[in-house]
From Swiss-Prot:
It comes from the Bacteria. GO terms for molecular function: hydrolase activity. InterPro entries: Peptidase_M20 (IPR002933), Peptidase_M20A (IPR050072), Uncharacterised_RocB (IPR012166). It comes from Bacillus subtilis (strain 168). To B.subtilis RocB. Pfam families: Peptidase_M20 (PF01546). This is Uncharacterized protein YqjN. SUPFAM superfamilies: Zn-dependent exopeptidases. Gene3D superfamilies: Zn peptidases.
Length: 547
């Protein structure tokens, strides 16, 4: 199988999409093995069998690397992708065809009345490939495999190292475990990672956006949790306690879509915080009011530091604490017209997770606190990272009953530090060349965007120079189930760039790839980009990195 023409690329992509590689599934494991075997079948890797490798991960999954190296050449472009996809439940009656592009399109055309108007037009045009993973991001992987094949045939004046990972859609464990391996490969093969070229798809800024983009960085994300411990009471005596659901609702009111958290950098703006999870922690119905609840928010960043954002979130928690008691006092006064009574005066305490650990040790003792933590970790069961983080906070808060009511600010995996190579000289020069080439060759006005908005594994390629202690010191699972590469022996600093395919509706049942651009323009554009990165002096990007 060759991977150069439009038909060949379509066949390759279809073969990748047909693997239901949903994060955490058997299909995710199987696709890594399939990629390994189709690469091993190439004459180049038959001659260099040790240069294509499946790297087993701690959880039984694997990531794959494939190196095509020129003799006595160090400069290497890293091609990054992920091969997992989100689930297919949203396809509904089309679920069984979600990973079969041809069958899915036929079914869509048979039931056009079920399609939104712009989706129907695209389906009828014949220019769009539908199916889970067609856009995000198996098309990008497909084109990168095509570039690797060109490298096998001596097309580039330098080395290509392809790495494709699982779990990008959930916790990015694949990339987190891959970073130390990349560091080791640099030493083993005597190569220098000059730049990383990701191929995540370009995202529409609004429905119907016709502009085409490439990215010189990737947006940052933290998952901020607020654990609320109220005071339980019977529903017949509501003023004797404090409902934890009331507490989280106030945090939600203050934080959801709060434009104060939006960050503007060079005309780009982060979306405001949005809630991703909210629930009380009662396990069964009763007439006891909920006394523990949690709410988790997706908060995005660009240049804002971890410590600055942490302080903003802490301030919001403190504001919520004041508003909660102000609200309760007002409603208490409203009720006193019916039944005069002396209300219980109390304030809501606000702690960070790190402070909660110290408070628990003070209240219950160091040994009891450690025992509670060890027991929780030993009996995690099937809890995911979000729920287990909440459980750890809850266990520690239970040792601090006298401090209730309280709000605890903590962080849960995954953490995506923002990265930008806009000012790296190598990336700056290459970006300018890409725009000029696209305009001259194809009449396309490619627009440069500093931060890829969809979150990506590029976040883990500049950890050597990133400070995230404000998050990790308040993350219950950090270094106990979730970690980030750190130190000079593990962390990397690599300039980044994202040039990817065009499509619409990622993570929706109408996900689709625009084939004319992705199969006819992108391969040439990506080839040009790789050549531009390799042809420039190795020192061009090195000077800034050493400062």
């Amino acid at each position: 199988m060759n991977w150069q023409t439009k038909d060949e690329l379509l066949a390759l992509l279809t073969s990748l999409v047909q693997y239901e590689s949903i994060t955490g599934s058997k299909g995710e494991v199987a696709l890594a093995e399939y990629l390994y075997f189709i690469l091993k079948d190439k004459p180049y890797f038959q001659k260099h069998p040790d240069d294509v490798t499946l790297h087993p991960m701690d959880d039984g999954r694997s990531f794959l690397t494939a190196l095509v190296k020129k003799k006595n050449v160090k400069k290497t472009v890293l091609l990054l992708s992920h091969f997992d996809v989100v689930d297919i439940e949203d396809y509904g009656e089309f679920k069984h065809m979600a990973c079969k592009p041809a069958e899915l399109l036929s079914s869509f055309l048979e039931k056009k009345e079920l399609l939104p108007e712009r989706v129907r037009r695209d389906a009828e045009s014949g220019d769009w490939l539908f199916g889970r993973g067609t856009m995000d991001m198996k098309a990008g992987l497909c084109i990168q495999l095509s570039m690797l094949e060109r490298a096998m045939n001596g097309h580039f004046e330098g080395n290509l190292l392809l790495i494709t990972v699982p779990d990008e859609e959930v916790n990015s464990r694949g990339m987190i475990e891959a970073v130390p391996a990349l560091k080791e490969m640099e030493k083993k093969h005597d190569i220098t990672l000059t730049a990383c070229l990701n191929a995540e798809p370009m995202f529409e800024k609004f429905p119907g956006d016709q502009q085409q983009y490439f990215y010189t960085g990737s947006i940052g994300k933290v998952l901020a949790g607020f654990f609320c411990k109220g005071i339980e009471t019977h529903v017949g005596e509501p003023f004797s306690g404090l409902n934890a659901n009331l507490m989280v609702s106030e945090i939600n009111r203050l934080l959801e879509l709060n434009a104060d958290y939006c960050e503007k950098v060079d005309g780009e703006v982060t979306p405001p915080p949005v809630n991703l999870m909210q629930k009380d922690l009662k396990e069964a119905y009763s007439v006891q009011t909920p006394h523990t609840a949690v709410t988790l928010f997706n908060v995005l960043s660009m240049k804002r530091s971890a410590s600055e954002l942490h302080q903003m979130l802490l301030k919001t928690a403190e504001q919520a604490a004041e508003e909660i008691m102000s609200n309760v006092r007002k409603k208490t006064q409203d009720f006193q017209q019916f039944e005069p009574f002396q209300p219980i005066e109390r304030d809501v305490t606000v702690l960070t997770f790190d402070e909660l650990v110290s408070r628990a040790k003070k209240r219950a003792g160091i040994s009891e606190t450690e025992r509670a933590l060890n027991y929780a970790f030993a009996n995690r069961g099937e809890l995911g990272d979000r729920d287990f983080s909440t459980k750890i906070v809850s266990e520690l808060a239970s040792l601090c009953k006298e401090d209730a009511p309280l709000i605890v600010l903590f962080y849960s995996p995954p953490l995506y530090p923002a990265v930008s190579s806009k000012d790296d000289q190598l990336i700056r020069n290459t970006a300018d060349q890409i725009k000029h080439y696209a305009a001259e060759r194809y009449g396309i006005a490619l627009r440069e965007v500093q931060y890829f908005p969809g979150l990506s594994d590029l976040s883990y390629l500049q950890l050597e120079k990133q400070e995230v202690d404000a998050y990790t010191s308040n993350m219950p699972l950090f270094n106990r189930g979730y970690s980030l590469p750190s130190g000079k022996n593990q962390a990397l600093y690599v300039p980044v760039l994202n040039v990817g395919p065009a499509g619409k509706d990622p993570h929706k049942w109408t996900e689709r790839l625009y084939m004319p651009y992705s199969f006819e323009v992108l391969p040439d554009l990506l080839s040009f980009t790789i050549s531009a990165l390799l042809k420039q002096s190795e020192s061009a990007g090195q000077l800034l990195r050493e400062k």
